[in-house]
Each structure stands twice: as structure tokens, then as C-alpha cells.
Amino acid sequence: VKSTNLMAFVATKMLERQEDLDTCTEMQVEKMKTSTKARLKTESSFAPRTWEDAIKDGELLFNGTILQAESPTMTPASVEMKGKKLPIDFAPSNIAPIGQNPIYLSPCIPNFDGNVWEATMYHHRGATLTKTMNCNCFQRTIWCHPNPSRMRLSYAFVLYCRNTKKICGYLIARQVAGIETGIRKCFRCIKSGFVMATDEISLTILQSIKSGAQLDPYWGNETPDIDKTEAYMLSLREAGP
């Protein structure tokens, strides 16, 4: 049900900005909307709701944090990548779900050598995470996508630690062929927290609370430091994979 509501929200918001979509992407989004409506009809026997209700619930679940098809509410910044300026849209109060599991609420721990900024690469299900702290809590995220005019699914997430309020990671969800598959993959990566797991026990715990995740009110509506974030993303892009 939650997945259906999320897809209803995403499809609707993207189609509100049809002028920003190319023909191929628009057709894929229309197909996604049609399949989501079919799923909604199938689910009506055990979770009756209207299309409008599904959209509202989908918006509440993630508050538009993963894919914001509306105009950004904060001033866009940009980074330099291979000689090109790329926009970064800073989503307001971009919160990832934390649930009530202690793995999320424990304090951050520096890397074994004490260098909290040493980057470590993790790969999981179509996403790459550059992790700069061994942090057991979950993150606030700021997202960007390099090609907003075509809504291509190539996203970068700057991760902030809940406890120290410092940048602790940089997540890239790679572009995939199907737009619906890509959006679902982004949802799973952020909602489940799988990409943040540093060991098998953490992975098991994070898996167990996937369906019961809730939004974390910790950050409120604080404004991110755009200059520091832009500089950090630029340094990561220059360093390469």
C-alpha cells in the first residue's frame, strides 16, 4: 500500500512538470501512473482509498524528499563536473526514516584511525555510498540530480549525521533504464537504510524495521549550509569513484 501511494505521488508530481520531460520519459511516467492506478484498484478490497488519498499519503511518507518534481524551495547551488555546471536542488528538511531501533540512535564513532573524514566506498543494489564516518545513526539528506530537464535517474545524496550534524556520507543512486524501477530503487535504498549497514547484524536489524519506518523529527526545518555542502560535493566529484 505504501509503495503504491508513493508511486502515485511521484507520477502525479512529475506529470505536473511535463514541460521538463522529454517524450520518452513522459511516456514512461504515464505508464507508471496507469500501472499504479491498476494496483490501487486491486488493493481496494483490503485498503480502500481514492487516487487523491493515495497521493496525499505518498507525499506524507517522504514529503517529496526523494524526487521533487516541483520547483525547489531553496536557492539552487551548482558544482563543477568535467567543465560543466550542474544544479543542486536543496530539498527542505530532507529526512530519512529512522524508526525506534537503537542502531539508529547510537552515537557516531570515528573510523579506527580517528580520521572521521576518510572516505570508504560501499556498493549495494544499484547505489554507491561514500561513507566518511562510521555512523550508526541514520541521516538527513540533501539531494540533487545532474539532469533535471530530462528527469534522469542519477541522484546524489549528501548525508548528514543526526548526532554531530556533520557531513558523513555521499550516496549516488546510479541511472537505470526504467524510470519506475529506478524510483523504486531510490526509495528502497533510503527507506531501508541497507546502504548504511556496516555489518551483517546491522543489515538484519535494518531489514526488520523496513516496513515500520517513520520520519525523524530531529532536524525540524533547519537550513543546510549550502556553501559547505557544495564544496564537499565538488571535492568528492574531483576525487572520482
Curated annotation (Swiss-Prot):
What the entry lists under Pfam families is as follows:
Flu_C_NS1 (PF03506), Flu_C_NS2 (PF03555)
Superkingdom of source = Viruses
Q: Which UniProt keywords apply?
A: Host cytoplasm, Host nucleus
GO cellular component terms given for this protein: host cell cytoplasm; host cell nucleus
Keyword set includes Cytoplasm: no
Subcellular location(s): the record lists:
Host cytoplasm; Host nucleus
Record InterPro entries: Flu_C_NS1, Flu_C_NS2
Q: What does this protein do?
A: Suppresses the RNA silencing-based antiviral response in Drosophila cells.
This one is known as Non-structural protein 1
Organism expressing this protein natively: Influenza C virus (strain C/Mississippi/1980)
Q: List the disulfide bonds.
A: none
Main subcellular localization, coarse class? host cell
